[in-house]
Amino acid sequence: MSTSTAHRARYVRPGTRGQDTEIIPFEADDGVPLTMLHVTRPGALTPRGPVLLVHGAGVRAEIFRPPLEHTLVDALLDDGFDVWMVNWRASIDLRPVAWTLDDAAAYDHPAAVRLVLERTGAPTLKAFVHCQGSTSFVISAISGLLPDVTTIVTNAVSLHTILPGWSSLKIRTLSPMVRRFSPTLSPKWGYKTEGPFSRMLRTTVVATHPECDNPVCAMVSFTYGAGHPGLWAHRNIDKATHDWIAGEFAGAPMTFFTQMRACVQAGHLVPTGDVPLIAPDLMAPPRTDARFAFLAGADNRCFLPEGQRRSFAHFDALSPGRHAHHEFPGYGHLDVIFGANAWRDTHPVIVDELRR
């Protein structure tokens, strides 16, 4: 893929048929600038109330609107939800900052929830959270910072951080070395390198990922997963989405990878200890009354589905029969959201859990 093609992909705004999108700037509780996207369908009623969509690391809110005929946003609007998508501090649409999961949990998510409730007048909301948007949102909920969130549907990872062997080896051994050369690790180096280290890494990664000719797809696999590719199955995504991916990933700071390294070593989320609002023991009984639904692709090679099984078991032991768990055969990490047949295989489960 040429640089020009990758840059063109960056500005695609798919999945917006009949939708209006209002972009609302706001600040996290520590002053970091964020944005909220309010997606509406003119004249449509929203009897199910507000739902907040929270993206993962190194992407942005638009990850929920790939170039598909039916996106998750479409499914939620069709079902009568009032859809809000936050660009928290990990978003590639914002000025890059060093961040940890604790920062997002303490400062971003409470501010985002507050904004939605203030704008809608609703007393509560529900949330669909993915990857590091999920881990940080769960930290926030466990710490008692999201009392107005009643349902949290979490995809891929939440309380327990279980990686494939190769990914575990990378984060334990390679991330400290990467930090010596770069403050970030970025899949966008697949089409735009930023110095000798990124060029060397890109050359190595592309040479060891011959499964497709999209260098960003290869870099995503190296950065976040263990597989060829690591975050989706090629059979599950169409060509337009595979091309679109080139513009939807950028860097994540090594401050995040350092915290995740500690979490992987522990097998569950571990706070940095630098943010007083965060509960010191995230395995203690959570300070939230929210109902959780834990989702995972059975073939996830970013975070193994075993992590979501353990998280469900943890919450189910505290409140038997209240929470839910689903695994999707044949799906991985992000194809749960933007797979070509996700409208049929995964989105109905997400919508159904948010209805409850």
Regions found by a protein language model. Give the residues of each.
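Alpha/beta-hydrolase active-site loop
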Residues: 99-119
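Alpha/beta-hydrolase-fold enzymes
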Residues: 118, 122, 132-272
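Short, surface-exposed "cap/lid" segments of acyl-processing enzymes
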Residues: 28, 35-92
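N-terminal cap/lid segment of alpha/beta-hydrolase-fold proteins
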Residues: 8-43
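Short beta-strand/loop motif that positions the catalytic acidic residue
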Residues: 288, 294-296, 300
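Glycine-rich "HGGG/HGxG" loop immediately N-terminal to the catalytic nucleophile
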Residues: 84-100, 333-336
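Catalytic active-site module of serine/aspartate enzymes centered on a nucleophile-bearing elbow/loop
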Residues: 318-356
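Conserved alpha/beta-hydrolase "acid-adjacent" motif
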Residues: 301-307
